[in-house]
């Protein structure tokens, strides 16, 4: 069974996150599970401590920042915890609907800058990468794809790194709704691209934003909901192979179950959809995406 990696999910929303993670491992699923606030992260640290197939992200979701559930105290705790992990997510900006006000934009932007600064403490510059090389769909010039086969380190073998060394680059999952350009500006201003690896979850910015993000070396996690829109499908087609990842963003809300067969089916649907859009073999795509995911998660 091929290993599939869900690079943006929310196991903390499941009624029994530990059981969901264990069932996912048995189904050949590895995961980057994001959180929405530091308290959730700390709770899940204990619950998922024995889940070798899950990397847990420290998060401060922009919705929670905008409505005050993540305030100054929670942000201070985020900054403390950021020194102890290299997995960050979900963080970002959301300027849609009720959050599209001058006050909310200012609050979110200030918090995002604080979060990015905290991520940079003790970080060392990344080795240069070549995003342009990632555009190849053959085996050449894909600098960000590991050579390990998808079956070499299955999720259940304890291979995902959980904590950071003083200089470890972080893996950061970004939420940006009506705010892709602003998020890219903030990430550039914080030198995030020189220090860390950035994943845009369910990218929904403009075409210019996408091209800018690709050139900056961003990765993009793509799931069935992104592929449900014409723009999402076109973006998935355009994203270079070496910068593509899978996601489900599931469970969608607190209390929802995520059976392993549903979880794997969602990832398979995304994989098949992307393969069709790009006109490449599904198995080849699966190998490339699994290798990229493993390189990001395993240190």
Specify the residue positions occupied by each region the protein language model found.
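Mid-domain alpha/beta scaffold segments of enzyme catalytic cores
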Residues: 1-299
């Amino acid at each position: 069974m091929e290993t599939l990696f869900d690079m943006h999910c929310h196991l903390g929303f499941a009624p029994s996150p530990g059981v969901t993670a264990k069932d996912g491992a048995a189904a050949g699923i590895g995961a980057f599970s994001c959180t929405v606030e530091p308290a959730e992260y700390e709770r899940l640290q204990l619950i998922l401590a024995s889940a070798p197939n899950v990397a847990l992200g420290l998060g401060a979701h922009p919705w929670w920042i905008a409505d005050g559930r993540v305030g100054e105290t929670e942000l201070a705790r985020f900054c403390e915890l950021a020194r102890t992990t290299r997995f960050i997510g979900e963080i970002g900006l959301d300027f849609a609907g009720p959050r599209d006000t001058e006050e909310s934009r200012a609050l979110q932007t200030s918090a995002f800058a604080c979060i990015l600064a905290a991520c940079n403490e003790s970080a060392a510059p990344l080795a240069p990468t070549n995003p342009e090389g990632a555009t190849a769909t053959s085996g050449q010039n894909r600098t960000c794809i590991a050579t390990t086969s998808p079956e070499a380190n299955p999720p259940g073998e304890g291979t995902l790194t959980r904590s950071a060394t003083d200089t470890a680059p972080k893996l950061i999952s970004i939420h940006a709704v009506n705010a892709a350009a602003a998020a890219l500006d903030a990430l550039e201003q914080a030198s995030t691209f020189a220090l860390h690896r950035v994943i845009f979850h369910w990218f929904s910015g403009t075409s210019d934003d996408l091209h800018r993000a690709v050139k900056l070396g961003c990765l993009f996690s793509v799931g069935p909901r992104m592929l449900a829109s014409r723009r999402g499908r076109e973006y998935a087609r355009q994203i270079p192979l070496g910068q593509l990842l899978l996601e489900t963003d599931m469970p969608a809300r607190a209390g929802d179950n995520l059976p392993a067969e549903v979880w794997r089916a969602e990832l398979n649907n995304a994989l098949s959809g992307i393969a069709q859009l790009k006109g490449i073999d599904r198995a080849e795509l699966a190998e490339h995406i699994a290798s990229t995911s493993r390189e990001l998660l395993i240190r």
